[in-house]
Amino acid sequence: MSGFYHKHFLKLLDFTPAELNSLLQLAAKLKADKKSGKEEAKLTGKNIALIFEKDSTRTRCSFEVAAYDQGARVTYLGPSGSQIGHKESIKDTARVLGRMYDGIQYRGYGQEIVETLAEYAGVPVWNGLTNEFHPTQLLADLLTMQEHLPGKAFNEMTLVYAGDARNNMGNSMLEAAALTGLDLRLVAPQACWPEAALVTECRALAQQNGGNITLTEDVAKGVEGADFIYTDVWVSMGEAKEKWAERIALLRDYQVNSKMMQLTGNPEVKFLHCLPAFHDDQTTLGKKMAEEFGLHGGMEVTDEVFESAASIVFDQAENRMHTIKAVMVATLSK
């Protein structure tokens, strides 16, 4: 794909609005081609390394299925399957894998790790998730939003993110809003707002593209008129138990529930979540949350909203694969 060949995909602000739109158009085409049985393999003979320092269901499956659909082969290197950063430096790992593979995906910790891989690998490197950014997720989100509001441009859409906005999702949403001109509202306690420098940079770019970025603690004001309400988990299994109580107390008022959906005043508002979601007590962590904190029926989102007609989370999950495929095709095929 012109302009993308051999480029890295590390964070959204590395691209222009036009380039982001091109990736979304390619993803939509690849999705349509797959469903119609007309998909053409562009990556036959390519070898792809998937480095996972953090486990994942959606990211791994998306990369593997996308690669297989396009004729490529993959090697999965899980948390215990490589020496990256332990017995071998990131720099050396990059130079070794770059000699063997045509592309490298990294999902793990600091953004500096994926940046170092990109600097030394000599082949395209894709960010499957770092502590700071989650760009492939936002590609899927944007495609999903386009599909559900086909008559609107991004700068005519309002996206609300409710909850802990200081994480990789909050940062990547800021970057997405900067490039698309979304009306993005981060509805969260001030302690959970992203770094001010990134907010300032992205707000200026968003305004140039016809949008705006708002940070507020006021739920009613923040969600008014929203087209989409998005949230993410409040706690992770690896976090200390003491953190759970602190985080839940901080975020309890920002749970996505039927009241919040009604406060939008938009009967067509849709619910988004990058998954996994703790919307019931059918998981180990969900059960612990229910027992410890009385969070029966959901944590960051209620089961009622998650299972409602407004929920489009599984469209999002499917679109992870189509958008990741677009990134690989764009960067590995001429």
Curated annotation (Swiss-Prot):
Q: Which GO terms describe its cellular component?
A: cytoplasm
Its annotated compartments are: Cytoplasm
Annotated L-ornithine binding lies at N168, D232, S236, M237
Q: Which reaction does it catalyse?
A: carbamoyl phosphate + L-ornithine = L-citrulline + phosphate + H(+)
According to UniProt, the name of this protein is: Ornithine carbamoyltransferase
Q: Name one GO molecular function term.
A: ornithine carbamoyltransferase activity
UniProt EC number? 2.1.3.3
Q: Has the keyword Amino-acid biosynthesis been applied to this entry?
A: yes
Q: Which family does it belong to?
A: Belongs to the aspartate/ornithine carbamoyltransferase superfamily. OTCase family.
Q: Which key words are in the record?
A: Amino-acid biosynthesis, Arginine biosynthesis, Cytoplasm, Transferase
Q: In which pathway does it act?
A: Amino-acid biosynthesis; L-arginine biosynthesis; L-arginine from L-ornithine and carbamoyl phosphate: step 1/3
Amino-acid positions noted as binding carbamoyl phosphate in the UniProt annotation, renumbered to this chain: S56, T57, R58, T59, Q83, R107, H134, P135, T136, Q137, C274, L275, R320
Q: What class of enzyme is it?
A: transferase
Q: Which Gene Ontology BP terms does the record give?
A: arginine biosynthetic process via ornithine; citrulline biosynthetic process; L-arginine biosynthetic process
Tell me the InterPro entries matching this sequence. Answer: Asp/Orn_carbamoyltranf_P-bd, Asp/Orn_carbamoylTrfase, Asp/Orn_carbamoylTrfase_sf, Asp_carbamoyltransf_Asp/Orn-bd, Orn/put_carbamltrans, OTCase_ArgI
Q: What does this protein do?
A: Reversibly catalyzes the transfer of the carbamoyl group from carbamoyl phosphate (CP) to the N(epsilon) atom of ornithine (ORN) to produce L-citrulline.
